[in-house]
Amino acid sequence: MKNVGIISLGCPKNTVDSEKMLAILKEKGYNIVNDKNKADILIINTCGFIEDAKRESIEYIIEMGKLKNRRLKYLIATGCLSERYNKELLKELPELDAVIGTGDFPKIAEVIEEIEKGKTVLEYGHANLLNDEGIQRILTTPNYYAYLKIAEGCSNACSFCIIPKIRGRYRSRKMEDILREAEELVKKGAKELILIAQDTTKYGVDVYKKFMLPQLLKEISKIDGLKWIRLLYAYPDSVTEELVEEIKNNEKIVKYIDIPLQHSHDEVLKRMNRNTNRQKIEEVISRLRSIPNMVIRTTFMVGFPGETEEEFEDLKQFIKEKRFERVGVFTYSREEGTKSYYMKPQIKKSVKIKRQQELMEIQKEISYQHNLSKVGKQLEVLIEGFEDGIYYGRSYMDAPEIDGVVYVKSNKKLKAGDFVVATITDAYEYDLVGEY
């Protein structure tokens, strides 16, 4: 029995694809290993969204290629980088035995059979035809939380983004399929389901001809044993009144939303082809703020082509004024195949980094003040582990791996997956400390 390992890079959407590949291979009799040094076959599920992600994926491929001097026999690249650079990857990285695009990963077992016959395999170009419905998953996350992908692809056509070319047009899954999978995940022990897609708020527009996310959330919340539902990748132009009401009134939906805004200035938003404007963004924020204790996570992009000092200043003031609880700031990455690649003037890297640092400094203080306001209050915490004599976990305000943690001092015997109500005693810029 051959050992197969997988390294999943990039976003949670990739994680789900990796989990499906593992299930396919296990069913075919392969042995799944977590230690790359024990693998006969290693799959790297790559990210190819921006420059840093591409570099990381390529570095991993080169690094893992060195294992071929030892036990490793075959190295396969899947995911976004593979879809985007297909033939080029095979040509430039001789370590690779196969390259599989985003729409072709269900063929993983057949591809391995082919490379074992001595062939080099290239499969790509079918992003729009991906059919992975009904494929089981072997969870790579701890069993108490799981990602639930509700749609594939994107049709938003932002001028800086290559995703529609890599992942295809927006395709919602059928509600009954999502609900079946959600029930299975909860049966396996998931207490938190994290809804993901390139754009979760557009769910249903293609299949049902209307926004169906509120209805989907309502149905998922009926599952016994499920405690938290978390919403990531919401798109500002599709946050409806109905969605806000569902989040507000549904006890299982955590009062947290991840809603990438990208910028505040109308001219920049127009160049980005964001299909929204400052006024609409203000309205969405105000709608969300009507939900008590709502935590808004957002991301902004600095150094977009033509971003003037005045436009950057506008963004700076916007962040100061809106006081988002969670903010990520990215520097614009010039990607071939996007409309913004040809826009002028392109901003110098040094300016982009300076702007990023400026915004993060502002946000650091906002985040600290927000955390400080929690001292003396009680927060429910999902325990995730124990390290250096203290437990750590997440509150409703924290998504896994992207937000902070809550450290919990306790003499009680706790285990990962337990929910406890901690009294917050101390605050840092991104983390909290509590007692239970």
UniProtKB/Swiss-Prot annotation:
Tell me which cofactor or cofactors this protein depends on.
[4Fe-4S] cluster
Any single Pfam family the record assigns to this protein: TRAM_2
What EC number(s) has UniProt assigned to this enzyme?
2.8.4.4
Known catalytic reactions: L-aspartate(89)-[ribosomal protein uS12]-hydrogen + (sulfur carrier)-SH + AH2 + 2 S-adenosyl-L-methionine = 3-methylsulfanyl-L-aspartate(89)-[ribosomal protein uS12]-hydrogen + (sulfur carrier)-H + 5'-deoxyadenosine + L-methionine + A + S-adenosyl-L-homocysteine + 2 H(+)
Q: Does the keyword Calcium apply?
A: no
- Entry keywords, A to Z: 4Fe-4S, Cytoplasm, Iron, Iron-sulfur, Metal-binding, S-adenosyl-L-methionine, Transferase
Domain TRAM, by residue range, is 372-436
Where is [4Fe-4S] cluster 1 bound in this sequence? C11, C47, C80
Q: Which BP terms in the Gene Ontology apply to this protein?
A: tRNA modification
| GO MF assignments | 4 iron, 4 sulfur cluster binding; aspartic acid methylthiotransferase activity; metal ion binding; protein methylthiotransferase activity
Give start and end of each Radical SAM core domain. Answer: 140-369
Instruction: Tell me which residues make up the MTTase N-terminal domain.
Output: 2-117
**Binding-site list for [4Fe-4S] cluster 2:** C154, C158, C161
Keyword Transferase applies? yes
Q: How is the cofactor bound?
A: Binds 2 [4Fe-4S] clusters. One cluster is coordinated with 3 cysteines and an exchangeable S-adenosyl-L-methionine.
This entry carries the following GO cellular component terms, namely: cytosol
SUPFAM superfamilies assigned to the protein according to its UniProt record, in alphabetical order = Radical SAM enzymes (SSF102114)
Tell me where in or outside the cell this protein is found: Cytoplasm
UniProt similarity note: Belongs to the methylthiotransferase family. RimO subfamily.
Q: What does this protein do?
A: Catalyzes the methylthiolation of an aspartic acid residue of ribosomal protein uS12.
Entries under PANTHER family matching the protein: RIBOSOMAL PROTEIN S12 METHYLTHIOTRANSFERASE RIMO, RIBOSOMAL PROTEIN US12 METHYLTHIOTRANSFERASE RIMO
User: HAMAP family, from UniProt?
Assistant: MTTase_RimO (MF_01865)
Name by which UniProt lists this protein: Ribosomal protein uS12 methylthiotransferase RimO
Organism of provenance: Thermoanaerobacter pseudethanolicus (strain ATCC 33223 / 39E) (Clostridium thermohydrosulfuricum)
What lineage is this protein's organism placed in? Bacteria, Bacillati, Bacillota, Clostridia, Thermoanaerobacterales
